[in-house]
C-alpha cells in the first residue's frame, strides 16, 4: 500500500464513491471535522487489520496522509501496541504463523512469566487445558489411515471421504466389541474348566434330542458346506451360542457383555451424531455466507508441501461446486409457476407409489424365500447334493442380496425426476435404500420368529411342551446365529465378486478398447449412498447376531479391514471423481443417524429373545431357565442382603419416579437455556445488521462532507 499510494488512491476513489479523487480533496484545511481515514477506521473491516500484522496500516492511511490521517495512524498504532502489551501468549494472538513465531522469539521471557503468573487454581487450569490438548493431539495422531482419508477427500471429495471415515469408525466399534467378548465370554469359559462336548444322540428329554456333530469322515464338499453355512464342526464351537456351558457366572457375564456392547455403541454413535449435527447446523444456517466462508476461512495456513496444498485446494473446489449446484436448483424452484408446481408434485406422488410397490414386492419375496427354505431342506434331492443344499440354505441371503443389488439403482434413476436438490436427492436415496435393507432384515427376522414361536401360538403342538419349536429348531439361538453368519459371509463374497468380476474388468476394457466404447465401459464413480448403506446393513447384521454368534464382531473386524483396502484399491484404480457431489456436513450427521436407526432395530429382536422367548433346553449357558433374563434375579439372590435390597430398589417406582422427575427438570432447563441462547443470537444478529447499516451511512456522510468542504 505504501509503495504506490497514487494507484491506491485512484482505486479507492473509483469505487462507489467511498473516496473522492486525491485532487478533489485539495490541500489540508484547518477546519474541524473528522477525516475520511478516521471515519473508515470505525468500520468493522478495519478492526481486522490489527490481526494481520503489527506493520499493516489502517484504511486510508497513505504515505502522504494529512495531519489528521497521521493522528489516526498514531492512534491505530497505540491500539495495536495496547494489544501487544496484553498478557497473552504468542500462540493465542490472531496473527499469521510467521508473525507469531517472531513475537514469541522477541518475548520468550515474558511468555514464561505470563504462563507462570496467576493463582494456583489458574495454573492448574492452564496445565489441565494443555494436557487435554496434548491428549487430543496424541489420540488424533493414533488414528489409522489419517493421510489416506485426506488424500481421498482431496481427490474424490468430502462425501467419499465420509464413507471411509465411517468405515474406520465401525472398525473401532467391532474391535471394542471383540475385546469385550474375549474378556467377558471366552476367558470365563476356559478358566472355568474345559467346556463339555455336545449332547449325544442317546440323550433324550421332553424337548427332543440335539446332535450337532457329523459322524465319521466327510468329503471336502461337505467340509466346504460346513464352513459356509456354519454347520457341522462349526456348530459346536466358540463361534455360536450353543457351545457355551450352563454356568451361572458365565451366564451373567455373557448377558452383561451384550448390554455393555450395546451401551458403548450407543454412546459412541451419539457422540459422533452430535459432532456431525454441529457441522450440519453451521453449514445449513445463514450464520456463515457459504462462499465467503470457504474462500476466506477454509484455508489451513499450517499446510506444508505441494501435495497437501493441492489436496486442500481440491477439497475447497468440491465444496464450492456443491454450493453452486444447490444454488442453481433453488433458483429454478423459486421461479416455478403454480402449474409447474402441481406437475412436479404429481410426478413425486406417482414416483413414490412406484417405490412403495417395489418395496412391497421385495419384502414379500424375502418372506417367501425364508419360508420355502425349511420345506426345500427336507426334500431328498436337496439332502443328496451338497451344492444344492448350500444354495437352499443361502436362499434368503441370495434373495436379500439380489434385491439390494437391483433396487438401489432404480431409486437413483427415480430421484432426479422428483426435482429436488442434490443433497435432498441423496437423502431420499439413502432413506429408501436403508428402508429396503433394514426392512428386508426385519422381514427375515420375522420369518425366523414365526418358525421359532410357531407364529406366536404357545399352545401349538410343536411349541406347547418347551415354549419354542423344538422339533425343527432344537437350538434356535444357534440357528439364528447361523443365519446372521451366512448373511455376513455372503455380503463379503458379494463385495469381492463385484470388485473382481465387474469393476476391474471394466477398467481393463477401458484400456483395451480406445474410443467412446472404452470410455463408457471404464467410467465409474464411487457410489457413496450404496456403499454407506452396505456398511450400515453389515453392522446391523452383526448387532443382531452377536448375542447368538459371539465371534461375529471379530469376523466383521477382519471383513472391514479387507473391505477398506479393497475399496481403496478400487477407488484409486477404477473410479473417477464424481461428476455431482453432495455436502459432507449432511453426510456426517445423516450417516450416524441411520447407524443409530440400525442399532435400534437390532435391539428389538435381541430384547425380545432375552425377555420373552424361552431359551433352548439342550444348549447354551441359559439352558434350564424360563427366560434368559431369569438368570439375573437368580444370581442377585445369591448376593448379600444389603446388595440385594439396593439392586431391587433400583427397579422400583420409588427410584424410577424421582429419576424421571429430575430428568424432566434438567431437560426443561436445557431447552429453556437453548431457547434463550437462540433469542440472544437472533438479537445480536439484528444488532450487527443495524450497526453495519449505521457505519455505512456515516461513512457516506463523511465522504460527502469531505468532498464539499474545500468548496465552502
Curated annotation (Swiss-Prot):
* Pfam families referenced in this protein's UniProt entry, alphabetically: TMC
What is stated on temperature in the biophysicochemical properties of this record?
Optimum temperature is approximately 40 degrees Celsius for chloride transport activity. Transport activity is decreased at higher and lower temperatures.
- Localisation per UniProt entry: Membrane
Cellular component (GO) terms are: extracellular exosome; plasma membrane
Indicate where this protein is primarily found. Answer: membrane
The transmembrane residues are 169-189, 250-270, 349-369, 395-415, 426-446, 484-504, 543-565, 593-613, 655-677
Annotated glycan sites: 107
* GO molecular function terms noted in the UniProt entry: mechanosensitive monoatomic ion channel activity; voltage-gated chloride channel activity
Q: Which residues lie on this side of the membrane: Cytoplasmic?
A: 190-249, 370-394, 447-483, 566-592, 678-712
Topology relative to the lipid bilayer, per the entry, is: Multi-pass membrane protein
Kindly give the InterPro entries that the UniProt entry links to this protein: TMC, TMC_dom
> According to the record, how does pH govern the activity?
Optimum pH is 7.4 for chloride transport activity. Transport activity is suppressed at pH 5.5.
Q: Which domain of life is it from?
A: Eukaryota
- Provide the catalytic activity annotation: chloride(in) = chloride(out)
What's in the keyword line of the UniProt record?
Glycoprotein, Ion channel, Ion transport, Membrane, Transmembrane, Transmembrane helix, Transport
Query: What family name appears in the similarity comment?
Result: Belongs to the TMC family.
Protein name as annotated: Voltage-gated chloride channel TMC4
Q: Which organism is it from?
A: Homo sapiens (Human)
- The encoding gene is TMC4
Amino acid at each position: 500500500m505504501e509503495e504506490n499510494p497514487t494507484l491506491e488512491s485512484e482505486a479507492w476513489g473509483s469505487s462507489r464513491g467511498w473516496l473522492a479523487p486525491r485532487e478533489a480533496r485539495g490541500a489540508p484545511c484547518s477546519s474541524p471535522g473528522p477525516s475520511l481515514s478516521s471515519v473508515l477506521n470505525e468500520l468493522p473491516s478495519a478492526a481486522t487489520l490489527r490481526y494481520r500484522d503489527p506493520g499493516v496500516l489502517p484504511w486510508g492511511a497513505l504515505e502522504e496522509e494529512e495531519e489528521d490521517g497521521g493522528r489516526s495512524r498514531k492512534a491505530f498504532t497505540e491500539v495495536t501496541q495496547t494489544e501487544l502489551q496484553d498478557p497473552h501468549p504468542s500462540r493465542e494472538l490472531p496473527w499469521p504463523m510467521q508473525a507469531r513465531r517472531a513475537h514469541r522469539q522477541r518475548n520468550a521471557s515474558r511468555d514464561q512469566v505470563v504462563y507462570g503468573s496467576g493463582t494456583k487454581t489458574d495454573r492448574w487450569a492452564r496445565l489441565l487445558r494443555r494436557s487435554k490438548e496434548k491428549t487430543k493431539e496424541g489420540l488424533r495422531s493414533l488414528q489409522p489411515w489419517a493421510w489416506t482419508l485426506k488424500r481421498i477427500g482431496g481427490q474424490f471429495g468430502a462425501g467419499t471421504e465420509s464413507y471411509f471415515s465411517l468405515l474406520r469408525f465401525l472398525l473401532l466399534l467391532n474391535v471394542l466389541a471383540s475385546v469385550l467378548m474375549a474378556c467377558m465370554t471366552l476367558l470365563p469359559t476356559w478358566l472355568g474348566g474345559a467346556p463339555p462336548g455336545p449332547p449325544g444322540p442317546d440323550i433324550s428329554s421332553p424337548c427332543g434330542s440335539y446332535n450337532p456333530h457329523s459322524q465319521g469322515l466327510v468329503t471336502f464338499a461337505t467340509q466346504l458346506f460346513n464352513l459356509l453355512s456354519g454347520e457341522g464342526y462349526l456348530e459346536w464351537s466358540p463361534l455360536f451360542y450353543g457351545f457355551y456351558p450352563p454356568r451361572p457366572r458365565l451366564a451373567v457375564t455373557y448377558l452383561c457383555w451384550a448390554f455393555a456392547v450395546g451401551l458403548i455403541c450407543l454412546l459412541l454413535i451419539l457422540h459422533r451424531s452430535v459432532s456431525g449435527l454441529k457441522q450440519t447446523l453451521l453449514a445449513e444456517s445463514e450464520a456463515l455466507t457459504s462462499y465467503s466462508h470457504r474462500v476466506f476461512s477454509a484455508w489451513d495456513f499450517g499446510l506444508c508441501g505441494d501435495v497437501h496444498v493441492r489436496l486442500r485446494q481440491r477439497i475447497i473446489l468440491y465444496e464450492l461446486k456443491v454450493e453452486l449446484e444447490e444454488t442453481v436448483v433453488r433458483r429454478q424452484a423459486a421461479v416455478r409457476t403454480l402449474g409447474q408446481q402441481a406437475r412436479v408434485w404429481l410426478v413425486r406422488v406417482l414416483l413414490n407409489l412406484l417405490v412403495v410397490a417395489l418395496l412391497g414386492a421385495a419384502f414379500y419375496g424375502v418372506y417367501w424365500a425364508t419360508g420355502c427354505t425349511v420345506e426345500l431342506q427336507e426334500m431328498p434331492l436337496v439332502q443328496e447334493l451338497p451344492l444344492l443344499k448350500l444354495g437352499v440354505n443361502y436362499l434368503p441371503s441370495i434373495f436379500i442380496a439380489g434385491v439390494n443389488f437391483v433396487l438401489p439403482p432404480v431409486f437413483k434413476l427415480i430421484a432426479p425426476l422428483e426435482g429436488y436438490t442434490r443433497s435432498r436427492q441423496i437423502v431420499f436415496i439413502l432413506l429408501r435404500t436403508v428402508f429396503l435393507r433394514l426392512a428386508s432384515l426385519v422381514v427375515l427376522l420375522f420369518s425366523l420368529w414365526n418358525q421359532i414361536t410357531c407364529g406366536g401360538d404357545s399352545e401349538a403342538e410343536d411349541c406347547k411342551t418347551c415354549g419354542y419349536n423344538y422339533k425343527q429348531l432344537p437350538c434356535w439361538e444357534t440357528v439364528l446365529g447361523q443365519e446372521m453368519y451366512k448373511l455376513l459371509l455372503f455380503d463379503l463374497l458379494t463385495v469381492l465378486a463385484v470388485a473382481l468380476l465387474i469393476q476391474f474388468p471394466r477398467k481393463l476394457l477401458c484400456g483395451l478398447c480406445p474410443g467412446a466404447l472404452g470410455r463408457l465401459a471404464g467410467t465409474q464413480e464411487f457410489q457413496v449412498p450404496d456403499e454407506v448403506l452396505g456398511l450400515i446393513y453389515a453392522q446391523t447384521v452383526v448387532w443382531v447376531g452377536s448375542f447368538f454368534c459371539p465371534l461375529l464382531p471379530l469376523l466383521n473386524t477382519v471383513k472391514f479391514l479387507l473391505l477398506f483396502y479393497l475399496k481403496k484399491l478400487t477407488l484409486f484404480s477404477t473410479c473417477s471423481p464424481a461428476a455431482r457431489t453432495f455436502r459432507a456436513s449432511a453426510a456426517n450427521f445423516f450417516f450416524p443417524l441411520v447407524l443409530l436407526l440400525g442399532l435400534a432395530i437390532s435391539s428389538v429382536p435381541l430384547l425380545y429373545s432375552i425377555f420373552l422367548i424361552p431359551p433352548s433346553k439342550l444348549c447354551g449357558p441359559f439352558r434350564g431357565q424360563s427366560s434368559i433374563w431369569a438368570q439375573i434375579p437368580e444370581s442377585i439372590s445369591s448376593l448379600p442382603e444389603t446388595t440385594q435390597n439396593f439392586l431391587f430398589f433400583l427397579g422400583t417406582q420409588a427410584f424410577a419416579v424421582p429419576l424421571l422427575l429430575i430428568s424432566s427438570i434438567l431437560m426443561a432447563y436445557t431447552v429453556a437455556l437453548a431457547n434463550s441462547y437462540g433469542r440472544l443470537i437472533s438479537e445480536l444478529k439484528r444488532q450487527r445488521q443495524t450497526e453495519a447499516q449505521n457505519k455505512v451511512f456515516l461513512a457516506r456522510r463523511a465522504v460527502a462532507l469531505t468532498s464539499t468542504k474545500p468548496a465552502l
